[in-house]
């Protein structure tokens, strides 16, 4: 598991990871957790690497993982849907800044891979939804 420090703590706390509120409390107790932060690089295979972008807003621990032109955003950015910031540790200003960070890191060849819905070209995103909030 590669995650932020906030997420490491949340994995073992069923209230912080919100599973308690869904009626299925889950607390991860494994030890194979790697804490990553902005600009960390995760070596993969065949010289491929994943670069970390800290993208808080949906929650304090959100990260985006960049692999070449693919951006795995999880809940930090779901294309063309406003970012949910009303949950524990959500922050509207950070969400706006994170959306702008993702936008600036992408180009016309970039693909956004969100945690929900389908992949989409970054050029098909209405960035004003996030930037002008």
Regions found by a protein language model. Give the residues of each.
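Metallo-beta-lactamase
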Residues: 17-20, 49, 54, 59-132
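Active-site HxH/HxHxD metal-binding segment of metal-dependent hydrolases
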Residues: 1-45
């Amino acid at each position: 598991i590669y995650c932020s420090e906030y997420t490491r703590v949340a994995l073992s706390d069923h209230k912080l990871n919100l599973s308690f509120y869904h009626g299925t409390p889950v607390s991860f107790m494994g030890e194979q957790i790697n804490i990553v932060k902005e600009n960390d690089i995760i070596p993969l295979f065949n010289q491929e690497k994943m670069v970390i972008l800290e993208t808080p807003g949906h929650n304090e621990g959100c990260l985006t993982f960049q692999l070449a032109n693919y951006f795995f955003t999880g809940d930090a950015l779901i294309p063309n849907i406003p970012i949910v910031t009303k949950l524990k540790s959500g922050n509207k200003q950070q969400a706006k800044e994170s959306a702008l960070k993702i936008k600036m890191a992408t180009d016309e060849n970039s693909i956004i891979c969100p945690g929900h819905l389908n992949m989409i070209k970054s050029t098909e995103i209405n960035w004003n939804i996030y930037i002008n909030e």
